[in-house]
């Protein structure tokens, strides 16, 4: 994967609601909040919590070269992804373990927790002996 995030997957210039990635990264958090969907906008307008402020400061003070090697570990699944997060690797806690999330421009406006689910999909096997009425007559081998 290339480290140039200005072009999207199809080779077109990335734009979020009519703004390029460079324009978004130059904007203030309050200006970006006006472009976000309602739920994310509301969480920013009401004020980020102290833990979210700490995470934002950690991202701002971090070296871009060390992000892939040392991801930022966080439990904040409800943190909206801002343009400043593009290119940063997070380890997001899903209730069981920390899962890596490499932030790409297409993720702007979503929450960190949306990219690693807390529940795994259940794939049931065959029913056991006696589990259903019809399985009572299956030979035991």
Swiss-Prot record:
One Pfam family of this chain: Ribosomal_S19
One biological process term in Gene Ontology: ribosomal small subunit assembly
Which PROSITE patterns does UniProt cross-reference here? Answer: RIBOSOMAL_S19
Q: What is this protein called?
A: Small ribosomal subunit protein uS19
GO MF term set: rRNA binding; structural constituent of ribosome
* Any one GO cellular component localisation term in the record: cytosolic small ribosomal subunit
Instruction: State which gene encodes it.
Output: rps19
Its domain of life reads Archaea
What the record says about family reads: Belongs to the universal ribosomal protein uS19 family.
Task: Tell me the HAMAP family matching this sequence.
Answer: Ribosomal_uS19
Annotated keywords? Ribonucleoprotein, Ribosomal protein, RNA-binding, rRNA-binding
| Annotated function | Protein S19 forms a complex with S13 that binds strongly to the 16S ribosomal RNA.
Keyword ATP-binding found: no
Instruction: Name its species.
Output: Halorubrum lacusprofundi (strain ATCC 49239 / DSM 5036 / JCM 8891 / ACAM 34)
Q: Gene3D superfamilies this protein is in?
A: 30s Ribosomal Protein S19, Chain A (3.30.860.10)
């Amino acid at each position: 994967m290339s480290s140039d995030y200005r072009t999207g997957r199809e080779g077109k210039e990335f734009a979020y609601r009519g703004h390029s990635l460079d324009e978004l990264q130059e904007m203030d958090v309050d200006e970006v909040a006006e472009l976000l969907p309602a739920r994310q906008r509301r969480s920013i307008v009401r004020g980020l919590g102290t833990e979210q402020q700490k995470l934002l400061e950690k991202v701002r003070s971090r070296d871009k070269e060390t992000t892939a090697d040392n991801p930022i570990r966080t439990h904040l699944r409800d943190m909206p992804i801002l343009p400043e997060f593009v290119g940063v690797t997070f380890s997001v806690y899903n209730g069981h373990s920390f899962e890596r999330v490499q932030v790409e421009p297409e993720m702007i406006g979503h929450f960190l927790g949306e990219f690693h689910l807390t529940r795994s999909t259940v794939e049931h096997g065959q029913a056991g002996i006696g589990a259903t009425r019809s399985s009572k007559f299956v030979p035991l081998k």
